[in-house]
Amino acid sequence: LDEEKLLKTISRIQKDIWIGINNYLSPLEQMNVVNQTLFSHYQFLGLNNDDDELRYMYINNAVDALKGNHFAIGILYLCLCQQLDLPVYGVCLSAHFILARAKDYITDFDNKEENREEVLFYVNPYNKGLAFSEKEINIYLNKIGAQPSDKYFAPASNRQVLFEYVQYLI
């Protein structure tokens, strides 16, 4: 792991996003700037399950190769947004990692029902930052036979996200 190289690359991507973001953009427009930078300018790709090799589960390899699985791409996206002070949080959706764009910053992650109401829309970083709503989450949960629960809709703390990521890796 070349930590210095990784941090320089992430910093460069962050600066490229920062150049395009201003306070006059709507939350959706801000996410579009992130998407354009990551997926058009840098050409990051989400790998399908067949290509989901172990090395692409790690953020450093995903950054080097410009491709990764849903967690690696999602955590990179999350880190970039949070470094830019955008209220974006991880959501651990039954075997998928998505992001939530909130109205404002969340400090108490224990009240999942209240935090769920703070979500403006969801982002699928694995699918080029596609924005979607609770409706699509409900369709997905129905498809896999899972019961809807606030935990599948509410933003999670970074600690919770890292816990899920480690569980995914082992």
What are these regions (language model features)?
Residues 1-169:
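A structural boundary/capping signal
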